[in-house]
Amino acid sequence: MTPTQNEIHPKHSYSPIRKDGLEVPETEIRLDDSPSGPNEPFRIYRTRGPETDPKQGLPRLRESWITARGDVATYQGRERLLIDDGRSAMRRGQASAEWKGQKPAPLKALPGKRVTQMAYARAGVITREMEFVALREHVDAEFVRSEVARGRAIIPNNVNHPESEPMIIGRKFLTKINANIGNSAVTSSIEEEVSKLQWATRWGADTVMDLSTGDDIHTTREWIIRNSPVPIGTVPIYQALEKVNGVAADLTWEVFRDTVIEQCEQGVDYMTIHAGVLLAYIPLTTRRVTGIVSRGGSIMAGWCLAHHRESFLYEHFDELCKIFAQYDVAFSLGDGLRPGSLADANDAAQFAELKTIGELTQRAWEYDVQVMVEGPGHVPLNMIQENNELEQKWAADAPFYTLGPLVTDIAPGYDHITSAIGAAHIAMGGTAMLCYVTPKEHLGLPNRDDVKTGVITYKLAAHAADVAKGHPGARAWDDAMSKARFEFRWNDQFALSLDPDTAIAYHDETLPAEPAKTAHFCSMCGPKFCSMRISQDIRDMFGDQIAELGMPGVGDSSSAVASSGAQEGMAEKSREFIAGGAEVYRR
């Protein structure tokens, strides 16, 4: 693997864990010395992948692991159709910016085989992917296997996406975040979407969903998958709808099935399937303030009403399971009836669908197909935990994957914040992955800056939840930052931050000179009123006496604070301080 050279801070470097032939990426942060001695480098999780030419794509990391198991074979695959790239491509007569990199024949399971990580885990097999994840998460490989076998965690790794670096989604592991990208009929291009992918993974996105609904859907996805070191998710109903000229009532199982196989062959790792939207649940949404806000949910609701029957996703769910088991594609069971406003949170429609999703989870597990369950949405803070509890109960602890939730509806332009509040809360309660929200939510398609803001905000929420859960090692990052802050190691503070660029820019707005990077104050308080500098001076001046006094108010009446000797000593030090001019900073 070739490490990337363009690090987000000069103190960062690619420093993989190497063991048993595996090379698991991590970022090492070099730290300056403390007054008391040197600091060990600090290591953090890395999602960005190796530096490559986007026209060539990433190295095929897992290819040999997949073929060595002897349970897959190449085959011709479905015929590529121009409609795969949408109506604009049909009008043009060709797709734009066709992928010209490697195009190996697709793989799928041999007859009678299931090539999912769950199937291997249930058979007692620890795969190379599980070993990779164990090193990445600093846990035992057997623990990874057992969590996947029980359905409490998933490793989304399509056999046709060998470029991906294995990662795990489960509540007993680090909380993960997803970034949504994708074009629309109004804006964006293939180049922009690949750039957004690389930008999102640079800042820490653990998975990326391609939600393209505009031109060149197939080709855009090919470019994204071939350049993605993280799992790629999709909502295949979007592309299927494009194939029937945008008319939901014209969708058929045959069109949808063909679209799913197309995406399986390309290497999509997980797919959002809104199979829990049942005909009987649609009337439950009629009194909502915001109705059905999920695109996929509204498409399937429209289809159910047009045909007055259960959706083809529900009726053909077992067949979908069989297809997914051939490629190791994971279900992301979509919450098509999620609430789009606080007024609709935790209502009958939302929870009826969730209960059905729980039943579908069990059916998928019968085929050894990995599953995660999608959740809301817009939920007041006091109603969030009920979502965790019911998902864990009805979906048997399958990983929960939520969009926020937003905890208030009054802040367009700031919904990355309104949702991060809810995201931290729901992740603390057991949600395994958080789908980011950008400042453009409800307003427009996010650009690169919005993607970065969304990723950083959600990395913050995920980390806060990991700290609150007591996840092993999570607080060490905070402690390293606190130590650097107290010792005025400014460059270390920048390097340890989630977003060094912004931290440096804010610092340098008022103190741009290079000597300010070693000053024992910032522009917030200035040199005279910096609490940490004063605290350091107190330690330097009275360190021995503080140590002798111990903790005031702790212990019995015979404590050092209560003793007459201690009181006399403090009185003497008081007189010395006043006689010396009563200045904290001695000149």
From Swiss-Prot:
Entry keyword set: 4Fe-4S, Iron, Iron-sulfur, Lyase, Metal-binding, S-adenosyl-L-methionine, Thiamine biosynthesis, Zinc
One Pfam match: ThiC-associated
Cofactor: [4Fe-4S] cluster
A GO CC term assigned to this protein in UniProt: cytosol
Compositional bias ranges of the Basic and acidic residues kind: 17-33
Pathway assigned to this chain's UniProt record: Cofactor biosynthesis; thiamine diphosphate biosynthesis
Reactions catalysed, as given in the entry: 5-amino-1-(5-phospho-beta-D-ribosyl)imidazole + S-adenosyl-L-methionine = 4-amino-2-methyl-5-(phosphooxymethyl)pyrimidine + CO + 5'-deoxyadenosine + formate + L-methionine + 3 H(+)
GO biological process: thiamine biosynthetic process; thiamine diphosphate biosynthetic process
Entry's cofactor comment: Binds 1 [4Fe-4S] cluster per subunit. The cluster is coordinated with 3 cysteines and an exchangeable S-adenosyl-L-methionine.
Keyword S-adenosyl-L-methionine among record annotations: yes
Residue positions binding substrate: 180, 209, 238, 274, 294-296, 335-338, 374, 401
Biased composition (Low complexity): 554-566
Matches recorded under InterPro entries: ThiC, ThiC-associated_dom, ThiC/Bza_core_dom, ThiC/BzaA/B
Binding-site residues for Zn(2+), renumbered to this chain: 378, 442
EC code: 4.1.99.17
Cleaved signal peptide residues: none
Region of interest called Disordered, as start-end residue ranges on this chain: 1-58, 554-574
Positions contributing to [4Fe-4S] cluster binding: 522, 525, 530
Family designation: Belongs to the ThiC family.
NCBIfam families in the cross-refs: PRK09284.1, PRK13352.1, thiC
Function according to Swiss-Prot or TrEMBL: Catalyzes the synthesis of the hydroxymethylpyrimidine phosphate (HMP-P) moiety of thiamine from aminoimidazole ribotide (AIR) in a radical S-adenosyl-L-methionine (SAM)-dependent reaction.
Protein's name in the database: Phosphomethylpyrimidine synthase
Provenance organism: Corynebacterium glutamicum (strain R)
Record gene name: thiC
